Amino acid sequence: MQALLFLMALLLPSGAGAEEIIGGVEAKPHSRPYMAYLKFTTKNGSKERCGGFLIAPQFVMTAAHCNGSEISVILGAHNINKNEPTQQIIKTEKTFVHPKFQYLSGFYDIMLLKLQKKAELNSDVDVISLPSSSDFIKPGKMCWTAGWGKTGKNNPLSVTLREVELRIMDQEACKDHSDYDYQLQVCAGSPTTSKSIGQGDSGGPLVCDSVAHGIASSYEAKAPAVFTRISYYLPWIYKVLKSK
């Protein structure tokens, strides 16, 4: 139940009050050309948003708990309230949720979106590399995540892309999370600072040395954030990418 609560918090409407924030700075416009902004409708009919990232011209990776209907993807965005000439808005043709996804625990929180057409790659819209199966990031590594989530507990969701640097933590650091599996997930942040993912940041990448190692999955007050560990899922990912 505890895991369910903080997964739900990442998707709460802007007035619902999440406990943690991204706590970073505004990103340089279009400096992260792989970033995707997702808009979708939940089962109860509410309009929500998540982050994601482009891993192939026609595929976006995000969190499985960001699934919904009428998923629209905006690429090349910095300010999502403006009609920027760099933006490419593409609807989703098909969703691929990991068959073992568990909403309550947050395990296998990964989803691929096949776009209706390929993105036009350029300096503002581009793919990000994935790790190898043996690329297991170790504690102490400094990485980055980004998103359009809330900038403070009582602040609205950000309209511009923000980024924050996080430290990869060891297993002990995520002991406050009711469900955590070191093989399936990455623990990043700090238990003593407010730098973390938060409301509206789900699905965004954890980037280390220009490689996407994680997917923003869940967070909890006074604990590091949890990211889905991408290297574990590579066989499934490449199987989906090869599908028609």
From Swiss-Prot:
Listed GO MF terms: serine-type endopeptidase activity
Q: Which CDD domains match?
A: Tryp_SPc (cd00190)
> Does the record carry Manganese as a key word?
no
Residue ranges of every copy of the Peptidase S1 domain listed in the record: 21-242
Q: Signal peptide location in the record?
A: 1-18
Q: Which InterPro entries match?
A: Peptidase_S1_PA (IPR009003), Peptidase_S1_PA_chymotrypsin (IPR043504), Peptidase_S1A (IPR001314), Trypsin_dom (IPR001254), TRYPSIN_HIS (IPR018114), TRYPSIN_SER (IPR033116)
Enumerate the UniProt keywords alphabetically. Answer: Disulfide bond, Glycoprotein, Hydrolase, Protease, Serine protease, Signal, Zymogen
Q: Which residues form the propeptide?
A: 19-20
- Catalytic residues per the record? 65, 109, 202
Q: List the disulfide bonds.
A: 50-66, 143-208, 174-187
Query: According to the UniProt entry, what is the EC number of this protein?
Result: 3.4.21.-
Q: Glycans attached where?
A: 44
PROSITE patterns for the chain: TRYPSIN_DOM (PS50240), TRYPSIN_HIS (PS00134), TRYPSIN_SER (PS00135)
Query: Biological process GO annotation list?
Result: proteolysis
Tissue-level expression reads: Mucosal mast cells.
Which family does the similarity line name? Answer: Belongs to the peptidase S1 family. Granzyme subfamily.
PANTHER family, alphabetized: CHYMASE 2, MAST CELL-RELATED, KALLIKREIN-RELATED
Q: What is this protein called?
A: Mast cell protease 2
Record the organism. Answer: Mus musculus
